[in-house]
Amino acid sequence: MHHIFVSPSGVRSIWLRNDLASSKQRLAAMEKLVAEQGILLTDSQVAALERKQDDDLAHGEIETAHPGYLGSQDTFYVGTIKGVGRIYQQTFVDTYSKVAMAKLYTTKTPITGADLLNDRVLPFFAEHGMGVIRMLTDRGTEYCGKPETHDYQLYLALNDIEHTKTKARHPQTNGICERFHKTILQEFYQVAFRRKLYLSLEELQTDLDAWLAYYNNERTHQGKMCCGRTPLQTLIAGKEAWNEKVTNLNLI
């Protein structure tokens, strides 16, 4: 039996040739093998992959496989309406298709965070024969607290939705919602508040819903998955990947 010795520099040169120089690249390659070939991993490999996925999300590096794979949620302060008070927007963006949903509230609490999902998000995905697997939020009190008593976290658990939080003290890492908030501020709120004096939350919500319908159904995007399509077109096109995943899970 011949023993072959490979020096550390030799190992590194092999890694470099195969784009495996960093541990992150090696974990990504392992992740790809699991997705493509369904190979079985050891407990330590599974733990390493889970740490990588959570770390990527926490630092704003989002990999998304299909609609519903990862939803991004955030709170946006809209402003004040006389006679109503402070207005907060709960925002949801599907990181794959960029389909966006939003609802207005006068408070920001765990209940309002859960209400957006219950009233708008999950019914929409159910209507399209899909669900939501994981949510990405910052560490605000409306999204984080004691899991056993926190309304938002209880709602996620009740619906079997995983929860990833952005890196502490770096709320900007939830970049998907940040970009959407800039868009909605410039294209909707700044225009709407110049044109109209709103007297109620319901009146503003009606106009917001009309703009969101335009955003999802007519406004094209140049993002990684959209490629010039609207968010809804991208979601419908990506439904095949969702169906394939469900089929594969049912075969296990």
Report residues per predicted region.
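The DNA-recognition helices of helix-turn-helix-type DNA-binding domains
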Residues: 1-2, 17-18, 139
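Short, basic interhelical loop/turn and adjoining N-cap
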Residues: 1-13
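RNase H-like DDE/DDD metal-dependent nuclease/strand-transfer catalytic core used by mobile genetic elements
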Residues: 5, 65-91, 95-214
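Residue-level detector of family-conserved "landmark" positions at structurally sensitive sites
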Residues: 9-11, 25, 135, 166, ...
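Residues in the recognition helix of alpha-helical DNA-binding motifs
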Residues: 10-17, 211
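Positions that flank functional sites
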Residues: 14, 30, 140, 170-171, ...
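Mobile-element integrase/transposase regions
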Residues: 21-93, 115, 119, 248, ...
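C-terminal domain-tail junction helix/linker
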Residues: 41-44, 55-63, 157-161, 183-252
